[in-house]
């Protein structure tokens, strides 16, 4: 049984906004105790909090994209990241897997001119895990982001948001 009245946060969250302000302070104090540089603010709903990590480093992220033909999809994927991402320290590793269309190889020639793009050739039968492992061995980044070639960036901060969580010493994968 839960009692609700006009001054209770269960009935009206705005009745005690200080409770949510104290929630922010508690989360911030936790980060301070464990040595994670961060700021905390109210989230979109009462009782939810948003963390902004304040890392000094901006490590290289290797974006691995397996591809077989579908040059238009790959271009759309890469262009969306190049145009929208607020995080700029990344490289693309395209893992080519038995394409046959000339336009695909023409696109590879075009993108290989960029400093942050490499095309690797995986000549075995399709196996998503093996293809990604093959690409990861060649990655220069400290962090690896696995994407499909038909993925498009929607939120400009998505790479930074994932990286921020992944950089925590108690996190291994996001």
Question: Could you describe each region identified by the protein language model?
Answer:
Residues 122-139:
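Glycine-rich, basic loop-to-helix element that forms the pyrophosphate-binding segment
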Residues 59-64, 91:
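Cell-envelope/extracellular polymer assembly enzymes that use nucleotide-activated donors
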Residues 96-107, 124:
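A conserved acidic beta->alpha catalytic loop
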Residues 65-76, 87, 98-99:
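Active-site beta-to-alpha loop of glycosyltransferases that engages the nucleotide-sugar donor
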Residues 144:
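Short aromatic/hydrophobic "clamp" motif used to bind/position activated sugar donors
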Residues 79-89:
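Short, acidic, metal-binding catalytic loop of nucleotide-sugar glycosyltransferases
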Residues 13-38:
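Catalytic core of nucleotide-sugar-dependent glycosyltransferases
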Residues 151-174:
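Conserved donor NDP-sugar-binding/catalytic core segment of glycosyltransferases
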């Amino acid at each position: 049984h839960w009692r609700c009245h006009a001054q209770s946060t269960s009935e009206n969250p705005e009745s005690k906004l200080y409770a949510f302000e104290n929630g922010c302070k508690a989360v911030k104090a936790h980060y301070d105790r464990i040595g994670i540089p961060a700021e905390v603010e109210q989230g979109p709903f009462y009782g939810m909090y948003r963390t902004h990590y304040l890392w000094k480093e901006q490590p290289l992220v290797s974006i691995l994209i397996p591809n077989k033909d579908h040059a238009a999809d790959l271009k759309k994927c890469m262009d969306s990241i190049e145009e929208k991402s607020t995080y700029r320290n990344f490289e693309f590793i395209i893992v080519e897997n038995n394409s046959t269309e000339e336009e695909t190889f023409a696109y590879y020639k075009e993108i290989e001119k960029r400093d942050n793009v490499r095309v690797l050739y995986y000549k075995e039968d399709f196996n998503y895990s093996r293809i990604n492992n093959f690409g990861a061995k060649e990655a220069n980044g400290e962090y690896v982001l696995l994407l499909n070639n038909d993925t498009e960036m929607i939120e400009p901060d998505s790479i930074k948001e994932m990286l921020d969580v992944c950089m925590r010493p108690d996190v291994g994968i996001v």
